[in-house]
């Protein structure tokens, strides 16, 4: 399982290469193999020329690509992406989503958590949760998959918090 965090969670005093090596250290991968694997992962996300940079020397989109490289380093079949575009501008969000779509086309399962319906409908399947319960599980392109813009603003029912009985 590879995990992509919303806030990147890069270690500020480690280089990009060292950040991507972290899960490989915990997996007991020998140093030379760890270095080669991390370098290849950074090259895969277009950052092979910034191996020695520190995270604070990068844009938000570049930091998210490092987080993606770290998630890919162990070659997981499943990638869990928690709001991977939440802290990014729209252009960079499209780039990151494109990378995740490419990973899916290459055979990875990508589980993407989002509150953004415009992102969710790009998936093949949507599982929507409300109050911890599954309220929809199906084709992302089915009419019932689309959340109405005002769904969060529904009027409370009589007797619920904020209303008078």
PLM regions: where:
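ABC family nucleotide-binding domain
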Residues: 1-123
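Conserved short hydrophobic beta-strand within the ABC ATPase nucleotide-binding domain
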Residues: 126-128
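Glycine-rich, phosphate-binding/catalytic loops in enzymes
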Residues: 22, 98, 130, 144-145
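Conserved beta-strand-loop-alpha-helix hinge in the C-terminal portion
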Residues: 133-158
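Long, low-complexity, intrinsically disordered segments
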Residues: 158-165
């Amino acid at each position: 399982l590879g995990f992509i965090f919303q806030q990147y969670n890069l270690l500020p005093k480690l280089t990009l290469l060292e950040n991507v090596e972290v899960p490989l250290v915990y997996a007991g991968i020998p140093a030379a193999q760890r270095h080669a694997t991390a370098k290849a992962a950074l090259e895969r996300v277009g950052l092979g020329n910034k191996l020695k940079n520190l995270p604070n020397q990068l844009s938000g989109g570049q930091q998210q690509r490092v987080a993606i490289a770290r998630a890919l380093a162990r070659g997981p079949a499943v990638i869990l992406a928690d709001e991977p575009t939440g802290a990014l501008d729209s252009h960079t969000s499209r780039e990151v989503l494109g990378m995740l779509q490419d990973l899916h086309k290459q055979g990875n399962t990508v589980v993407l958590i989002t509150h953004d319906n415009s992102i969710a409908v790009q998936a093949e399947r949507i599982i929507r949760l409300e109050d911890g319960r599954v309220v929809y599980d199906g084709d992302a392109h089915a009419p019932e998959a689309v959340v109405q813009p005002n769904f969060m603003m529904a009027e409370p029912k009589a007797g619920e918090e904020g209303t008078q009985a």
